[in-house]
Amino acid sequence: SIGAHASFLDKKNFGRTIISWDRLLIHQLLKDQINFMKDMTKECDISTTHFKPHGALNYLASRDEDLAFEIVKFLKINHPELIMLAPALSKLAKVSEIEGIPTALEVYADRTYEDDATLTPRNIKGSLITDPEKSISHIQNIIHKGSIISRSGLLLPTKIHSICLHSDTPNSVEISKQICILLNSMSISQSKLIDLI
């Protein structure tokens, strides 16, 4: 599946800098970035199937219901055919589902979680999982228990449609290979989001 992965206009820090926002800013950046992706995929004769906020935009939308609503409202009005790919148990996922947007729930192979199901901030030691064995154990536990597992050990039940792994995480290639091996060993097949939602 190919999706539009929109972020704040922060090229220097790869969209990971939190920026003050308002409705006009959010709608403009979503318009520009989603349309750019759709134009590019159209030229290649393929479809854009989903939308996912990136970096700080995703981080904030997971916690801020007002921001989540602005994103969902824009998608619902302008791109209702797109699946919303949202962090499992996030405010964004909740608002998207309430508003009737097709919603896929995602967990992270290379990030730890807090008790409220949000990602541990990157400035906290250990928030980024770079060891392949630890990452695979992390994902295996999530799948087996059907829950996000916080750093304190709290189980947070959720459905899971997608596993995210950041390409700039150290050892990401090896982690990706091992995730594929794990899923195959559990008889979990890889599918397009449009076939799941």
Regions found by a protein language model. Give the residues of each.
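Hydrophobic faces of well-ordered beta-strands that scaffold small-molecule active sites
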Residues: 2-6, 49-53, 84-86, 103-107, ...
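Glycine-rich tight-turn/loop motif centered on a GG-T
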Residues: 12-27, 61, 118-130
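C-terminal domain-boundary segment and adjacent tail
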Residues: 82, 174-197
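Active-site rim beta-loop-alpha module in soluble metabolic enzymes
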Residues: 89-147
